[in-house]
């Protein structure tokens, strides 16, 4: 007796009719298609990191400057002296604003103590007011108005 050959229906046309399924359309059940729609539960459980990763990340460190005005410096001068940020070196008063946590010296107000001030940044107005009374500024990286 001859055994009949079993049809395994492995071709691409089976279950779709004669002409359906010839093109590349209607592939919603294959691969990763539909992961955001009808396969969402599988995606959330087995591949939770599939979606995402969009957006913008700023990689430069941008910390805002901590400013101090000349008038404010005049007001807190005694407190800075008590905290050890004002010292005497070779008969000269040295004010270390950088160590006190300030980054920029602004020119509003007046400062009357002839001294040497250590700070990273200072405005042109602050520099001109201090040079008028004979003070000096050290470690000024850039001057901006």
UniProtKB/Swiss-Prot annotation:
It comes from the Archaea. Residues 1-13, 19-29 have a biased composition (Basic residues). Residues 1-33 are annotated as: Disordered. The keyword Oxidoreductase does not apply. The keyword RNA-binding applies. GO terms for cellular component: cytosolic large ribosomal subunit. SUPFAM superfamilies: Ribosomal proteins L15p and L18e (SSF52080). It holds the Pfam family Ribosomal_L27A. Keywords: Ribonucleoprotein, Ribosomal protein, RNA-binding, rRNA-binding. GO terms for biological process: translation. Part of the 50S ribosomal subunit. Binds to the 23S rRNA. This is Large ribosomal subunit protein uL15. It comes from Thermoplasma volcanium (strain ATCC 51530 / DSM 4299 / JCM 9571 / NBRC 15438 / GSS1). The lineage of its organism: Archaea, Methanobacteriati, Thermoplasmatota, Thermoplasmata, Thermoplasmatales.
């Amino acid at each position: 007796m001859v055994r009949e050959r079993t049809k395994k229906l492995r071709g691409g046309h089976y279950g779709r009719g004669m002409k359906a399924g010839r093109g590349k359309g209607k592939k919603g059940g294959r691969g990763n298609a539909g992961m955001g729609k009808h396969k969402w539960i599988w995606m959330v459980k087995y591949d939770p990191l599939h979606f995402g990763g969009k957006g913008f990340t700023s990689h430069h460190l941008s910390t805002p400057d901590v400013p101090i005005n000349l008038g404010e410096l005049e007001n807190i001068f005694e407190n800075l002296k008590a905290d050890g940020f004002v010292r005497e070196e070779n008969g000269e008063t040295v004010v270390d604003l950088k160590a006190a946590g300030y980054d920029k010296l602004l020119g509003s107000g007046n400062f009357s103590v002839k001294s040497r001030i250590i700070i990273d940044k200072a405005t042109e107005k602050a520099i001109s007011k201090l040079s008028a009374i004979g003070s000096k500024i050290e470690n000024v990286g850039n001057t901006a108005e």
